[in-house]
Structures are given as C-alpha cells and as structure tokens.
Amino acid sequence: MAQQIIDLNPAEQLMLDVHSASDQAVFLLQSRAGEHEITLTFDQAQAIALAEATHQLFDLLDKQYPRPINELEIPYLDRMSPQVPVRPLLHVACFQLAYQAENDRTVLIAAELRRIRTLEPQEPRLVRFWITREQLLGIARRIERALVGPGPICPACGQPLGPNGHYCVRSN
C-alpha cells in the first residue's frame, strides 16, 4: 500500500488551539489549502519537540539563508478558534521540519500515530504544511505561550510584557 501524503501548499488560515486536561495539554492544528481543511491533534511532548526544532531550524537558516523575520507577518494564533465541527484527520506521532530555498518556504511534516489493529502493515499518513518562516515562528511562539501558562501578553503582537512593558512592532 502506498503512503498517503497530503500537501497543503501553501497552507492558509493556520490555527493552533490548546486544550489542557490536568497537567497534559492536547494541541489542535488546523489549516486549509483551497478546499482542503485539515485538523491534526498532538500531545505536549510533540509540541515541545516542535518548538525546539523550530528554533534549531532558524539557527541554521540564519547561517545558510539569512533573511530578517518580519514581526508584522508573524500570526498571533492565540486569538483564533478552530472551525467547527472539529474532525481531526489524525493524531501526530512526530513532526519533521524542512526548508525549500527556491520558495523560501518551511515545510512542517506531520506523521500519523498508528495503532496496530490489523496484521497488514500500513504506512502512516503524512501531512505537509508549506508555510512561511513567520508562520512557523508563530506556531512555535503559540506553543511556548501555552506551555508557560498565563502571563501578561501584549494584545497587539502576542509578545510577553515585561515589568516596564515592551517595544511593540505592531502598535508603534
């Protein structure tokens, strides 16, 4: 059986929601490309790994393909709600990140968590989100804010507010 790969190229209307149950958080990533709407769920461990991998990728990109990040284009995903009804396509086992220099796009690859129910081997489905650097950074920041917990956040840009406020790129 051939592996099913779903490409959202380019992925639009990204949304990341978090549902906390006791000490574990379940994340919901939703996006669309054209008429295809995809919803994935993943656990806190995958979220932490994704945020860390994002920063590692950005360290590499800064060295090999430097380009300033446009803070105004980073989506503030905290204010977005999922399209209802929510019907997750799959639960993510792991994420991978890639970069395509020709289009200056990052690729967020989600591999399905398979539970063995049959004797026939099945390849896990993959979903590839072709997104900008700013979109990927928005996902990582949303994950980090969800894991840190509530704190003062700038309503305009989503950055943490220090004791003396901060320089907001969106409102200045």
Predicted regions and their residues:
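Intrinsic, low-complexity N-terminal interaction/targeting segments
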Residues: 1-24, 69-126
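Structured beta-strand/turn binding interfaces of compact recognition modules in eukaryotic regulators
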Residues: 32, 43, 100, 111, ...
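Conserved helix-adjacent loop modules within structured domains
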Residues: 58-69
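Short cysteine/histidine-rich zinc-coordinating motifs and their immediately flanking basic loops
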Residues: 165-172
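The feature marks the first
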Residues: 1-60
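Mixed-charge, glycine-accented linear interaction segment located at domain edges/termini
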Residues: 40-42, 113-165
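Short, structured motif recognition centered on aromatic/hydrophobic residues
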Residues: 25-31, 50, 54, 106-110, ...
